[in-house]
Amino acid sequence: DDLFNINAGIVKLFGVTTLDVVR
């Protein structure tokens, strides 16, 4: 989903991809 991709990009800015962990 686009929302998940956008959130993933925002999280990556923090240096941690929590969404990737959830997936």
UniProtKB/Swiss-Prot annotation:
Entry's EC annotation: 1.1.1.37
Biological process (GO), any one: tricarboxylic acid cycle
A molecular function GO annotation: L-malate dehydrogenase (NAD+) activity
UniProt keyword Secreted present: no
Catalytic activity from the UniProt record: (S)-malate + NAD(+) = oxaloacetate + NADH + H(+)
The entry's keywords: NAD, Oxidoreductase, Tricarboxylic acid cycle
Disulphide bonds in the chain: none
Binding site for substrate: 23
Keyword Membrane: no
Residues annotated for NAD(+) binding in this entry: 7
Family under the similarity heading: Belongs to the LDH/MDH superfamily. MDH type 1 family.
Subunit architecture: Homodimer.
Name this protein carries in UniProt: Malate dehydrogenase
